[in-house]
Amino acid sequence: MAFLALGINHKTASVDVRERVAFTPDQMVEALRQLCRVTPTREAAILSTCNRSELYLQQDEVEAEAVLAWLASYHRLSLDELKACAYVHVDDQAVRHMMRVASGLDSLVLGEPQILGQMKSAYAVAREAGSVGPLLGRLFQATFSTAKTVRTDTAIGENPVSVAFAAVSLARQIFSNLQRSQALLIGAGETITLVARHLHEQGVKRIVVANRTLERASALAAELGAHAILLADIPDELHNSDIVISSTASQLPILGKGAVEQALKRRKHKPMFMVDIAVPRDIESQVGELDDVYLYTVDDLHEVVAENLKSRQGAAQAAEELVAAGTEDFMQRLRELAAVDVLKAYRQHAERIRDDELSKAQRLLANGASAEDALAQLARGLTNKLLHAPSVQLKKLSAEGRVEALSMAQELFALHEGTEKP
């Protein structure tokens, strides 16, 4: 039995590669079922965000190569290209990695809380797909518990920062007074919701939320006193926007160079600040070629968050210690779990012997034997049969020179120098 955590993230792969290896919500269930069908994987879950695509697996033996080959084939890129930026963690290292990810210790923004919710969503989708069972399920529950402990027992979450907060911080650097700025937010998911709240707190003059469905855009807009439009209405609104921040799950770009050029003309080339948080990207990279556009992607946010990270570095060590403890606790419980099946089988074996010997004793009594004789026969039968298999195996192992088996037997049966301890 083996646990694996493999994939790519913002530290190992560029945004170009990450967007090619990303899974859309619509792909997830079938991808999980296909993964379990065509690779030697018993249980699986997929976490796909703008900063990482990771697979969490339970296999009988480590078969990472087969999974990487499937991942490359699924996303139509070469195996060599994927291997160049992929990582594979096995067993306790896989457990530790999952717990670090869920705790925000492996995030672009140290300690950011959104990743835990994203991991819980990944677990829920895996349950829907039927690809997660008792073993991976236990690992997810242990991961969530450790992440909660990290969040409550350390200062890792203080001075809240996130990709959303970093985007707004960058906007504040470019526009000294956000209260005179107008913002267009594309999408209505968790990240855009956080962006909207941060902008609202900064007193942005006007916020417009554009989404594929008006219902979700309206719900977010109502919360903040903003305006809601459909994606199709963006060209009519774009020229009003000083700030454009986009994060959707679209497979195709939402904004192209031509649309932005038209908006700039209507703005008389007043600068526009744009942040594309999506993977795959919502805003064509060519937009960044325009003179009056400041276009940033998630990979450009590193410097913005550097200052905020300093305040969390002290808490990171305490968080790492909690993750190490959580990892060891889970692995210990897993080792104990491995003994359960053996103990269950041995108990069933002992109960069969007990039932057989009890039946013999009852027949002796029915045939007129004394209770003393029946009990003596029962005791001898139980002793001989319970000791028979261990005795045969110990002699065999001793003859083979397996002296460690004798020491283990003494420990197993709590024997000391060949006799039972009083």
UniProtKB/Swiss-Prot annotation:
Active site: 50
UniProt-annotated site: Important for activity, residues: 97
Cross-referenced InterPro entries: 4pyrrol_synth_GluRdtase (IPR000343), 4pyrrol_synth_GluRdtase_dimer (IPR015896), 4pyrrol_synth_GluRdtase_N (IPR015895), GluRdtase_CS (IPR018214), GluRdtase_dimer_dom_sf (IPR036453), GluRdtase_N_sf (IPR036343), NAD(P)-bd_dom_sf (IPR036291), Shikm_DH/Glu-tRNA_Rdtase (IPR006151)
GO molecular function, one term: glutamyl-tRNA reductase activity
Keyword annotations from UniProtKB, A to Z: NADP, Oxidoreductase, Porphyrin biosynthesis
Catalytic activity: (S)-4-amino-5-oxopentanoate + tRNA(Glu) + NADP(+) = L-glutamyl-tRNA(Glu) + NADPH + H(+)
SUPFAM superfamilies: Glutamyl tRNA-reductase catalytic, N-terminal domain, Glutamyl tRNA-reductase dimerization domain, NAD(P)-binding Rossmann-fold domains
Pathway: Porphyrin-containing compound metabolism; protoporphyrin-IX biosynthesis; 5-aminolevulinate from L-glutamyl-tRNA(Glu): step 1/2
Annotated binding of NADP(+), by residue: 187-192
GO biological process: protoporphyrinogen IX biosynthetic process from glutamate
PROSITE patterns: GLUTR
EC number: 1.2.1.70
Amino-acid positions noted as binding substrate in the UniProt annotation, renumbered to this chain: 49-52, 107, 112-114, 118
Top-level division of the source organism's lineage: Bacteria
Keyword Oxidoreductase attached: yes
Similarity-based family: Belongs to the glutamyl-tRNA reductase family.
Other observations noted: During catalysis, the active site Cys acts as a nucleophile attacking the alpha-carbonyl group of tRNA-bound glutamate with the formation of a thioester intermediate between enzyme and glutamate, and the concomitant release of tRNA(Glu). The thioester intermediate is finally reduced by direct hydride transfer from NADPH, to form the product GSA.
Function: Catalyzes the NADPH-dependent reduction of glutamyl-tRNA(Glu) to glutamate 1-semialdehyde (GSA).
Domain notes: Possesses an unusual extended V-shaped dimeric structure with each monomer consisting of three distinct domains arranged along a curved 'spinal' alpha-helix. The N-terminal catalytic domain specifically recognizes the glutamate moiety of the substrate. The second domain is the NADPH-binding domain, and the third C-terminal domain is responsible for dimerization.
Quaternary structure (record): Homodimer.
Name assigned to this protein: Glutamyl-tRNA reductase
Source species: Stutzerimonas stutzeri (strain A1501)
Lineage: Bacteria, Pseudomonadati, Pseudomonadota, Gammaproteobacteria, Pseudomonadales
